[in-house]
Amino acid sequence: MTITVGETYTFKLTSGEEVVGKVTAVEDHIVSLHDPVSVAPGPQGMGLIQSMFTADPKESARLNINNVTIFALTDSSVKAKYIEATTGLVVPDKKLILG
């Protein structure tokens, strides 16, 4: 699987942590991520929290792909929560209008 710039991926790190982020660049063994968040347990189940609290939010974070055990495109429901967590925009459910 090739990592595509502009897509949102979930990365499982060698530490066991899961990171979700929109890919902004891919260079050799480095993937740049916009607004990376970590998956963490909370009172209502799994949630998304900021991965790096002291980093400049205007800059992409760089992830060494050698520290990744597995990755995949992010599930659409998690991607909607990622967009909500990073932008404040709520993605509406897709519904068909019936006649």
For every predicted segment, state its role.
Residues 2-99:
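Conserved RNA-binding domains used in RNP assembly and mRNA/RNA metabolism
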